[in-house]
Amino acid sequence: RLMIRNFFIAICSIIFCPYNLQGQNGVSLETKLVHKLTLVADSLTKHLKPWIVPVSIFDVRKYGAIGDGSTLNTTAIQKAIDACFVAGGGTVRIAGGEYVTGTIELKSGVMLEVAKGARLLGSTNLKDYPDKVERFQSVMNVIHKYRISLIYAERAERVGICGEGEIYFRGEAKNFPGPETIGALEGRPFGIRMIECNNVVLKGITLRNSAAW
């Protein structure tokens, strides 16, 4: 919270105080503005509630996931996420291998962790990426049919992705060579798609080669 406060003040000072303008009574306008920004920042940080992730761990292997780099684990990983959500939140851990998956949906209170040495691999089969039609659709969704992604969340609270491992989306052209992918339209899945989510954490994780931005 302190870092957010200081960052807010610093950015606003850079934007709004490019010159050291002198005001009345020898107090610069910059000083006055920084003081006001400090008051605003203090007010904002009072309303920030850091997310403390529950201690419960949900290892995807206990739900049937196999980290052999080829088995499709969408159902197993989603089972772990759903169990974590029902339990009131915690960490869904991916460890000890390479886990292929299609679209998985994060839910409130769930922290998805890819542990050190582990990798989450995006499926290269478009059939593993079902459409997720959001409540409020954008131009990109309606016209270009951008509705597929590897990781999806909508209206989730306290949700995140962390770990020292890697999410490799495998979005290279060679993996999506069909005519439906030409022009980067509906055939290229997003990496992470979060809509109307609050208190989102993205920490430590390496993200590589998403098929779409």
Feature locations, PLM:
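Extracellular/periplasmic carbohydrate-active domains that bind, remodel
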Residues: 22-213
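Bacterial Sec-dependent N-terminal signal peptides
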Residues: 1-27
